[in-house]
Amino acid sequence: MIRAHLFSEPDNSKLWAKSTGSDAFDLILKVLLWTAPWYYCLTTLFFTWLIILYPRPTLACSVAAWLFWFTSLDTLEPDDRKNTLKASEAVSTSAKTSEETAKPSETREDGEWNTLKNTLEADAQNLMSGFQMLQRRWSQPKTTTLKTEVKEQQASQSPSVEGENEPAGVKSNEATKPSVTEEKEKNAEQNKRRERLSISHIVTELAKKDEVSSESGSNEIVNAKLKNEQLDSNFTLLDAYLEPLVHLHEYSRRSNTLFFFYLPIVMSILIFCLPTQALFIVLSSVFLAWHSPPLQAVLFCIRRISFFNLLYEKFVIGKTKEPAKPVPQPSSNEPPAPSAENKQPSVSSPEKKESPATHLLKVIGSSPYVVHSNHTNNTLTDKESSDPTEKCLYLIEHQRYWVGVGWLNRTLPTDPPNFTNAGSTDPVAEPTAQLLPPDGLAWIDDKWSISPWTFTDTFWAQPAKTQFRTAFTRSREWRRRYRVAPPAENEKPHTSRTNTASSLSSTSEDQVSTHGSISSAKVTAIPDSNGAEAL
């Protein structure tokens, strides 16, 4: 079974998959399925693409990097040895205490030796250098551990101890003590050297979280501990991916510094020397890894930047600044709005979201738009235009071209709605399924007048009367005149005009007159309701 999980996931959320029986094939599958750690995936994919593009320079840089590591590890030393020498100091302290409290009793000496052996073996396993780990993993050489050495020493000392009396045995033990002390010192020196040369120690420490020691009571350690607790409480997926890089400075060494200074130079040389085919390979790799967690995290960080967010909205999704909505001016015949003192809050029903049909009825009731004089059809004369009770309703229809399908009323989420009121982006119902106006209003024109299509690009820019190659959007204007009937004398000025159930009816498609082709509009059935808000 393969255990694949992220650093930020708890133990109970680890994913298990069945192994194929081959370690190399399992690693390849984990990298391709993005279940391995992110640096394994990125380094493997990047190294594979470089091998395909430039095998010689890639192999040369790889060999140079490995030679740098294995040749400079003998001379490089850590900057801070306090954390790295804790294990060796603990071993030396335990060895001194065991020497001082040693007795000729075999039981007590065996217990101390067992404790010391376990400690040294654990430290040797944790502080094993990277080259020795590779040897042990692939070739698995036979290495002499401290346990076998102790057994050999006991076997060599047992004949001399058995044939002598107690004082002689004590003397023999005293004689062997210096050799044991020298062996302990030698092991401590080897542990120090292994700790300095340990690549696995660097890699494993980068993958772990920094643990603040509770021994010291200084303010710096307390503040660091509180900071780590705050980070743990707000630990996100992006923090898990960037965790090795965030904690890199805490394990800074000359080897890391030189390597990460040497690596960008080589990478910059390779990047500037890449031809067009390499650029195509890089773009294809980005396309293949688009849904991978690391790339999504990088894109999420880029979109949070205001400059890139502005470019993304302007050139990718075509989001522009919405025009200012015109302030509706109340008609002279309409009653004034009630003041704040006389206005009583309605307790009958909560506020409901306006539907497109309800919004259209309100637009008809208080439309500030008057018929323009440049319209040739259905225009008003000077005598008629002077009548303040006559107004004109303008609606804008938007459509988008879909490759292989044609022009459809379905638009993108960033596009304007299918039908909007002129000068705003509020959605309204389709004109072919419009209701009769509410009480107090009446249509002047029997049919809707439709202007020709205006073609624009995918960002609703560059308008043109004829369709061009990159015209993926179009819009046209629907207009119809209506008259506002003066209120009756016996009617209260604030009579509700929203009850339109008695005057609801659908108009047929033959009421529409166009100057060009009219797209087939869907006639929506209007259910019976007590008001326009139920639409």
UniProtKB/Swiss-Prot annotation:
Glycan attachment residues as annotated in the record: N374, N377, N409, N418
Pfam families attached to this UniProt entry: Pex24p
Peroxisomal-side positions: 1-31, 284-535
UniProt record, GO biological process: peroxisome organization
Compositional bias per record (Basic and acidic residues), positions renumbered to this chain: 97-111, 180-194
Cytoplasmic side: 53-262
Pro residues composition bias: residue spans: 325-338
Primary subcellular site in the record, as a coarse category: membrane
InterPro entries in UniProt: Peroxin/Ferlin, Peroxisomal_PEX28-32, TECPR1-like_DysF
Composition bias, Low complexity: 339-349
Record key words, sorted: Glycoprotein, Membrane, Peroxisome, Transmembrane, Transmembrane helix
Transmembrane feature ranges: 32-52, 263-283
Subcellular location: Peroxisome membrane
Residue ranges, annotated region (Disordered): 87-115, 142-194, 323-353, 482-535
Family assignment from sequence similarity: Belongs to the PEX28-32 family. PEX32 subfamily.
The protein's name in its UniProt record: Peroxisomal membrane protein pex32
Organism: Schizosaccharomyces pombe (strain 972 / ATCC 24843)
